[in-house]
Amino acid sequence: MLKNSLSGIAVMFACCAISMQPATSAQGPEVVRKVLMQHDLPMPGWSEALVSVEIPVGGREGRHTHPGPLLVYVTEGAITLDYEGQPSKTYKTGDTFYVEADKIHEGINMGNVPARALASFVTPKGQPLTTQAK
């Protein structure tokens, strides 16, 4: 049961890790994010969030980080992940990926249909889900 609870929490935090601010016009079409659920975890000092994300064709999130781990499940389309220190990788419908805390990354939709995902964020309480990279 604890394992399931921790998995659920990790999923929630990953969602929060996704930037909650829309992409700027310089980054292409606007990325849409919606917090579906957010609450404190039973672990002192931590909270979690589950976020739906839609990246339109040609859209990009902008380079950013999260203060905690992020788990992402791609529900439609494909997301190309540019991840600090690694080659870009494309994740398609049904794929999952993990982003470490404080690692600069960016999700990009290079496909011909909108990309949608569920992201779970686990973050220190009171911290923003996402911080744009400098």
Residue ranges: model-predicted function:
Residues M1-A10:
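Bacterial N-terminal signal peptides that target proteins for export
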Residues C15-A23:
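C-terminal segment of classical bacterial N-terminal signal peptides
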Residues G28-R63:
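A short glycine-rich, His/Asp/Glu-containing loop-to-beta-strand
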Residues W46-L50, H66-P69, Q86, D102, ...:
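Extracytoplasmic
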Residues I55-P56, G85-D102:
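Short acidic-glycine-tyrosine-enriched beta hairpin
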Residues R60-G62, T80, F97, A101-I108:
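Histidine-centered metal-chelating micro-motifs
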Residues H66-G85, D95:
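Glycine- and acidic-residue-biased ligand/ion/polar-headgroup-sensing regions
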Residues S88, D102-P128:
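Ligand-binding loop in jelly-roll beta-barrel domains
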